[in-house]
Amino acid sequence: MPKAREWWSNLYKDFLALGIDGVWNDMNEPAVTDDDIPEENRIGTMPYDTPHRGGGNLPAGPHLLYHNAYGRLMVEASYEGIMKVNPEKRPFLLTRAGLLGYQRYAATWTGDNWAGWDHLKLSVPMSITLGLSGQAFNGPDIGGFLNNTDADLWAHWLGFGVFLPFARGHACAGTNDKEPWAFGEAIENTSRIALERRYRLLPYFYTLFYEAHKTGVPVMEPVFFADPKDLRLRSEQQAFLLGDNVLVIPAFAENPVLPYGIWENMTLIYGEYSDKYQAKLKIKGGSIVPVGKVIQSTTENSF
């Protein structure tokens, strides 16, 4: 209902007055804890026949109709509430649920993944698919949300995860610590190199996000965007492009299918290619990629 969305939107003024810069709308399908229901009967949300009143241009209907729309309407209300308070500042909003058009208001992530090599490898095609579906600002929980993560898995994941549009490490309560410094000095150094590489590429990311905002072209592209006529590239799910000019090849990739042409190694940080976990970066011949300095926080940037 419009009145409910207005009520929700107005709640943000109190949060933002505390100095909060970003908001995360989580479990907004909405999720329902149903542990007391037999597993085969769980649906994870409210019963599908739960009525929604609608309102405005929206008809009344069951939750089966509104399940995805609920998250979409929620993030729109959240966005409007943030903009009321800070109209001169671009808001950061993250959502788990949404529907067509929600990319105008919020970033998203790929859900509660597992700490395992299969989910690490799925990160690339899942993020590419979200981008092709209109949601340019997306990425997985680096390191895996559920289950424990070992040092090797974490380092491999972060080594390419820093080049995903939304780069974030996350963990479920009850799993092991998954901070960049949690796996010893060597992996801490690996993490530092990876994060500094992303910081240096922030001007390029900024440009790609602006282009995505204006045109809908994703930030993270499948490699066949380099040459749509090259049928070899259609099935590649390990390497990916950042815009037209940067090719990312994760360290885990085995015999990736790469586009023809001139692609030169791109160096951003001293020692990056002596670290086995870092993704290889290649710059397209004849192109220009803007890069910045190594910084400690995005607040040090002028854009």
Q: What residue spans do the PLM features occupy?
A:
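Catalytic-domain carbohydrate-binding cleft regions of carbohydrate-active enzymes
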Residues: 1-278, 282-284, 299-300
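Edge strands and adjacent loops of beta-rich recognition modules
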Residues: 287-303
